[in-house]
């Protein structure tokens, strides 16, 4: 029920109002809850990869929000307020990531749905 409340009362309004702080906070909290459910299968950690977990914590400390991991990982993700903030995160963490065998990429959302047409 708590995840449902986060989605309905925080995540969706955050998207609708372009409020990255609200959206990101909801994503992070949902990810913490879900990661906690899998911690026993992941050596006691909410992260499937300790390296991704360390990098995610560093991104959070540097101002990123909406931090989590894909399904069982090891892909981690975070949101930044703008391109400049994303590049600051990238340049601050890329060498640390490489040392842990990780790759950091900057990606943008595609703000339009898919189109289906005749072949």
Stretches with model-predicted labels:
Residues 15-119:
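Glycine-rich, charge-dense phosphate/pyrophosphate-binding loop(s)
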Residues 1-3:
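Conserved mixed alpha/beta catalytic, RNA-binding, or beta-rich assembly cores of soluble enzyme
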């Amino acid at each position: 029920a708590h995840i449902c409340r986060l989605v309905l009362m925080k995540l969706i309004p955050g998207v609708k109002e372009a409020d990255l702080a609200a959206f990101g906070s909801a994503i992070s909290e949902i990810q913490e809850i879900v990661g906690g459910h899998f911690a026993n299968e992941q050596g006691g950690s909410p992260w499937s990869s300790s390296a991704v977990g360390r990098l995610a914590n560093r991104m959070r400390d540097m101002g990123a929000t909406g931090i989590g991991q894909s399904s069982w990982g090891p892909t981690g993700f975070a949101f930044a307020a703008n391109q400049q903030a994303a590049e600051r995160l990238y340049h601050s963490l890329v060498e640390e990531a490489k040392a842990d065998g990780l790759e950091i990429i900057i990606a943008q959302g595609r703000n339009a749905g898919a189109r289906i047409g005749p072949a």
